[in-house]
């Protein structure tokens, strides 16, 4: 399983999140994998250690794959979650109040942005309540 945080805009126009994972199915050679996702583009970005970004929404429906750096994300409701290397953020909060983030370790945040096609179905599975 690959840890994934789903971030979306609720009917209240607030950003909300839930922790879960990307579902992987058995593949060749004993590997686990997903099917191919329809994407529009992929880009890479690096932010120096100590970086932060004030309140904003996601510019598009996207997957953000953290390669290095540990971040604290916050919603306007005061809820927090952390992203670490290897984690995926499934960002769908493209409107509303948005979120902010701060780097919390001494590493730069290196990440890949995968902009999803409108037809893309992400195999996100939320963590069961109480787990």
Q: What residues fall within each predicted segment?
A:
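Short acidic, Pro/Gly- and aromatic-enriched capping/linker segments at domain boundaries
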Residues: 1-8
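Short, acidic, Ser/Thr-enriched surface-loop or helix-capping motifs
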Residues: 10-11, 66
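Short acidic-glycine-tyrosine-enriched beta hairpin
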Residues: 46, 76-94
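Conserved short histidine dyad/triad with adjacent acidic residue
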Residues: 9, 21-30, 40-58, 93-96, ...
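Short histidine-centered beta-strand/loop micro-motifs
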Residues: 32-36, 52-58, 74-75, 81-82, ...
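Short, conserved beta-strand element in jelly-roll/cupin
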Residues: 46-49, 57-73, 114-117
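A short hydrophobic beta-strand segment most commonly corresponding to one strand
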Residues: 88-94, 104-121
